Curated annotation (Swiss-Prot):
The keyword Transcription does not apply. GO terms for cellular component: host cell cytoplasm; host cell plasma membrane; membrane; virion component. This is Matrix protein. The gene is M. Plays a crucial role in virion assembly and budding. Forms a shell at the inner face of the plasma membrane and concentrates the HN and F glycoproteins. Acts as a negative regulator for transcription and replication by sticking to the nucleocapsid. This effect might be regulated by the cytoplasmic interaction with tubulin that dissociates the M protein from the nucleocapsid. It comes from Sendai virus (strain Hamamatsu).
Length: 348
């Protein structure tokens, strides 16, 4: 059984909403490109800004149609067939141009895609035709990029391995960063286990503008019967001296003194940002890698939910601090389905 502290609404009402991407089609029945920029922190209104970009679009393969014309018609591709949707995260860079120039440069990119496998399925992106507005990101674009297939493709099993695949950019998600950075809590600190400690986790409840059941993300009903989604992130540990008693009021007072502010960004799809504006103990600060602002991309926390809602409207409706006993050190973590060193199973 866990104890819960609900944060006041003002802690997330200013930047806790993301507007949807407008899904409109032109006369050719193709989606009209659109760029969506949200602000996290207090970025400058004009001039140079730091932008994190995520390119959204469709995976396509060339198709051939039966033709009764000349022989040359039989060898010419007349169009492309969509075989899936996905994204390409290209990271943060300093940018001083306009949003529309950036959108045009992104949609003009020629991106080829290959599905492969290492320890898990991967998507390989190779990029050409990098325009001037994208030069700040060119170092990463020119090198080629590899991502976990389940994080960047909605249905990687639909991408053929025996055909050429291109990625056509239609939408651009941008996060304009101010004082808040996109620092992440290192995995070693997030997995930290300390004796005599209480784990502080955040339960984030969202409302989205699309039905998600058919895509495998089941909502939960709140007290008013509304459908909501939620996910959890780990913030840190509260530790007291041996012999001291943990009380709910003590944990709540520690959290209240932090004066946390929450916001939504578009890093990796949908991202959850936490900023500490109050006092923070040295122990807790060290667990946040000495950062007062941290980012939790939903792409890492819950990849499938992220794939389903990354183009929809998303709104924070509640944020709860969940106080749970820290997992003991002697508990073993099993990341693999196959247990090691049991019976005939041996680690290679």
């Amino acid at each position: 059984m866990a104890d819960i502290y609900r944060f006041p609404k003002f802690s997330y009402e200013d930047n806790g909403t993301v507007e949807p991407l407008p899904l409109r089609t032109g006369p050719d029945k193709k989606a009209i490109p659109h760029i969506r920029i949200v602000k996290v922190g207090d970025p400058p209104k004009h001039g140079v800004r730091y932008l994190d970009l995520l390119l959204l679009g469709f995976f396509e393969t060339p198709k051939q149609t039966a033709s009764l014309g000349s022989v040359s018609d039989l060898t010419e591709h007349t169009g492309y067939s969509i075989c899936g949707s996905g994204s390409l995260p290209i990271g943060v860079a300093k940018y001083h141009g306009s949003d529309q120039e950036l959108l045009k440069a992104c949609t003009d990119l020629r991106i080829t895609v290959r599905r492969t496998v290492r320890a898990g399925e991967m998507i390989v992106y190779m990029v050409d035709s990098i325009g001037a507005p994208l030069l700040p990101w060119s170092g990463r674009l020119r090198q080629g990029m590899i991502f976990n297939a389940n994080k960047v493709a909605l249905a990687p099993q639909c991408l053929p391995v025996d055909k050429d695949i291109r990625f056509r950019v239609v939408f651009v998600n941008g996060t304009s960063l101010g004082a808040i950075t996109i620092a992440k809590i290192p995995k070693t600190l997030a997995d930290l286990a300390l004796p005599n400690s209480i784990s502080v986790n955040l339960l984030v409840t969202l409302k989205t503008g699309i039905p998600t059941e058919q895509k495998g993300v089941l909502p939960v009903l709140d007290d008013q019967g509304e459908k909501k989604l939620n996910f959890m992130v780990h913030l840190g540990l509260i530790r007291r001296k041996v012999g001291k008693i943990y009380s709910v009021e003590y944990c709540k007072s520690k959290i209240e003194r932090m004066r946390l502010i929450f916001s939504l960004g578009l890093i990796g799809g949908i991202s959850f940002h936490v900023q500490v504006t109050g006092t923070l103990s040295k122990t807790f600060m060290s667990q946040l890698a000495w950062k007062r602002a941290v980012c939790f991309p939903l792409m890492d926390v819950n990849p499938h939910m992220n794939l389903v809602i990354w183009a929809a409207s998303v709104e924070i409706t509640d944020v709860d601090a969940v106080f749970q006993p820290a997992i003991p050190r002697d508990f073993r973590y099993y990341p693999n389905v196959v247990a090691k060193n049991i019976g005939r199973i041996r680690k290679l």
